[in-house]
Amino acid sequence: MAVPVVQAVQAVHLESDAFLVCLNHALSTEKEEVMGLCIGELNDDVRSESKFAHAGSDVCTVPEKVDSIRVVHIHSVIILRRSDKRKDRVEISPEQLSAASTEAERLAELTGRPMRVVGWYHSHPHITVWPSHVDVRTQAMYQMMDQGFVGLIFSCFIEDKNTKTGRVLYTCFQSVQAQKSSDYERIEIPVHVVPHVTIGKVCLESAVELPKILCQEEQDAYRRIHSLTHLDSVTKIHNGSVFTKNLCSQMSAVSGPLLQWLEDRLEQNQQHLRELQREKEELMAELRSLE
């Protein structure tokens, strides 16, 4: 008889502005994986099942079963800077986790809500959305520190063979001990994207930080190679050209579209502000006519 797996988390609610930042980050490069940390809170949401009972001519609702489910609410994300770029894996240093915890404490003071680091995300460019055995082991390590910790994966730059169109897939998972084995296996967690009319200030700041972080990563890689003493002049010139080319590509693929999106949002906000101002003037005119 199979032993049922007890899930530490039953669902994840990912706010749409945080989802947007994750998606932009995942689409920023198709050569290596990118990563970040999720900030939010873990709540026990009440779930009840009820049935109707008849008492004479009255109908009343009688609770049949009331329990709670653990839901991770992700409000914002922190984009992490990669010290080592790899196409098949990412690593989060203890220093980055500590800095993210400090940022979560700052957000908790601003919002008055119990914010903390509740998960991590990374991209899978050109490969399946399902976590690798390394991802599953990494997730298990994080869950040793926090049972409510979740992992998100964004699979991008993949093409539908039938329609020849690009697709982006995402999933959420945790790790559980495999039966009759010392290894871990993944368990999928339902993830729901919660719509938002506007983008929050914290997520907006994270989106703006993306080009800066990508530029810093390129600078670090260039300085690391340029510091080697055995390189000849031609190799150094070539490396400088590659560095310049990569920065220009980032400006074209990331900074330019981001700036255009921000300008469009600003124009929409200004248009909405003008409409509200016009509506206010009309209401004030009606109010004066009633006096």
Swiss-Prot record:
Entry's cofactor comment: Binds 1 zinc ion per subunit.
Domain MPN: 12-179
E.C. numbers: 3.4.19.-
Motif (JAMM motif): 122-135
GO cellular component, one term: BRCA1-A complex
Main localization (coarse): nucleus
Residues bearing the modification N-acetylalanine: A2
EC main group: hydrolase
Gene3D superfamilies per the UniProt record, alphabetical: Cytidine Deaminase, domain 2
Localization of this protein: Nucleus; Cytoplasm; Cytoplasm, Cytoskeleton, Spindle pole
Highest taxon of the lineage: Eukaryota
Protein task: Metalloprotease that specifically cleaves 'Lys-63'-linked polyubiquitin chains. Does not have activity toward 'Lys-48'-linked polyubiquitin chains. Component of the BRCA1-A complex, a complex that specifically recognizes 'Lys-63'-linked ubiquitinated histones H2A and H2AX at DNA lesions sites, leading to target the BRCA1-BARD1 heterodimer to sites of DNA damage at double-strand breaks (DSBs). In the BRCA1-A complex, it specifically removes 'Lys-63'-linked ubiquitin on histones H2A and H2AX, antagonizing the RNF8-dependent ubiquitination at double-strand breaks (DSBs).
Subunit structure comment from the entry: Component of the ARISC complex, at least composed of UIMC1/RAP80, ABRAXAS1, BRCC3/BRCC36, BABAM2 and BABAM1/NBA1. Component of the BRCA1-A complex, at least composed of BRCA1, BARD1, UIMC1/RAP80, ABRAXAS1, BRCC3/BRCC36, BABAM2 and BABAM1/NBA1. In the BRCA1-A complex, interacts directly with ABRAXAS1 and BABAM2. Component of the BRISC complex, at least composed of ABRAXAS2, BRCC3/BRCC36, BABAM2 and BABAM1/NBA1. Identified in a complex with SHMT2 and the other subunits of the BRISC complex. In the BRISC complex, interacts directly with ABRAXAS2. Identified in a complex with ABRAXAS2 and NUMA1.
Protein name listed in UniProt: Lys-63-specific deubiquitinase BRCC36
Gene: Brcc3
